[in-house]
């Protein structure tokens, strides 16, 4: 489960509940890639498959998303809160036998966006990385950074998630409202600021704040949809900026699946709650409190880890 609870809270009608899933192929008409019985990671959205973005594996950035309303009941072909889903085979990634289903599910929003962000920023074990916002995506970013070997500083308001961030390997978690935020970050990053930062907070004011926590010639990535940046500070500090949404299916599938293998103990800590699909309202209510990590939803009976 990801951000769908926000529609539940607001009462906004949506036919797109669920945009990350792992399932089993029950029919594979006209597919040479998959067969009945294969476990697959279900990619979000419904890329056309023919535009330049899709041809390069960047289906999430498709310039002509297919309208699958008639086929799936979802205008963007998501709708994973269901027992069955129709999806083009190029938007399904086979899951190797040695990866458990609940771990494979983490390859989407839990790890995917920040995996791309870390790759684009070329994060290494020598870096100190700041993660702004410790929702499920931000917590997954901590896992990605720690698995790489980087040192992690995190910003988070919610005490539950701040504690979970430390369990996952953040060396220091700071309340972003702290009046001495910049001083605290610089004190643990050589006096100059962090090497790289990722904002996942979706807070309007966060981007400009995070920018000031970077050293000169630092790297900044966003998995968020809110906020703005002062161009004069970007230029003045010589900051490299990246946008990251999801991972390239053609280029990074094997590398991301290996990341899932390497991070399994941390992914188990990240997964804090499991619900049957019939309990989805309770799952939404929990997510609204913020007192959870990654929440898994199961059709029918809850599977045990």
PLM regions with names:
Residues 20, 38-39, 53, 84, ...:
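Residue-level marker of beta-strand positions
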Residues 90, 97-178, 183:
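Mid-domain Rossmann-like dinucleotide-binding core that forms the NAD(H)/NADP(H) cofactor-binding site
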Residues 219, 230-270:
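Rossmann-fold dehydrogenase core element
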Residues 1-5, 34, 43-93:
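Cysteine-cluster motifs in flexible loop/terminal segments that predominantly coordinate metals
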Residues 6-55, 96-99:
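Glycine-rich beta-strand-centered segment in the early N-terminal region that forms part
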Residues 121-122, 163, 167-242, 281, ...:
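Glycine-rich cofactor phosphate-binding loops and adjacent beta1-alpha1 units
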Residues 208, 212, 253-305:
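C-terminal hydrophobic helical "lid"/dimerization subdomain
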């Amino acid at each position: 489960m990801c951000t769908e609870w926000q529609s539940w809270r607001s009462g906004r009608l949506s036919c797109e509940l669920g945009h990350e899933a792992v399932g089993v192929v029950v029919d594979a008409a006209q597919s040479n890639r998959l067969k009945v019985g294969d476990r697959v990671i279900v990619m979000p959205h419904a890329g056309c498959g023919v535009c330049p973005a899709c041809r390069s594996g960047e289906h999430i950035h498709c310039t002509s998303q297919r309208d699958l309303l008639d086929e799936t009941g979802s205008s963007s072909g998501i709708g994973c809160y269901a027992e069955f889903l129709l999806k083009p085979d190029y938007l399904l990634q086979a899951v190797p036998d040695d990866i458990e289903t609940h771990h494979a599910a983490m390859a989407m929003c839990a790890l995917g966006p920040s995996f791309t962000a870390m790759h684009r920023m070329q994060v290494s074990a020598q870096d100190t990385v700041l993660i702004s916002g410790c929702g499920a995506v931000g917590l997954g970013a901590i896992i990605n950074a720690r698995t790489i070997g980087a040192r992690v500083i995190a910003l988070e308001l919610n005490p539950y998630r701040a504690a979970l961030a430390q369990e996952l390997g953040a060396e220091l978690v700071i309340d972003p409202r702290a009046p001495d935020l910049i001083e605290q970050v610089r004190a643990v990053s050589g006096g100059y600021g962090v090497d790289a930062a990722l904002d996942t907070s979706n807070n309007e004011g966060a981007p400009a704040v995070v920018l000031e926590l970077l050293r000169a010639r630092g790297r900044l990535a966003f998995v968020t949809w809110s906020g703005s940046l002062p161009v004069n500070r970007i230029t003045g500090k010589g900051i490299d900026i990246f946008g990251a949404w999801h991972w390239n299916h053609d280029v990074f599938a094997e590398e991301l699946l290996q990341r899932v293998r390497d991070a399994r103990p941390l992914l188990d800590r990240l997964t804090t709650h499991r619900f049957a699909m019939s309990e989805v309202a309770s799952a939404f209510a929990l997510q609204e409190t913020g007192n959870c990590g990654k929440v898994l939803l199961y059709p029918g009976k809850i599977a045990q880890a």
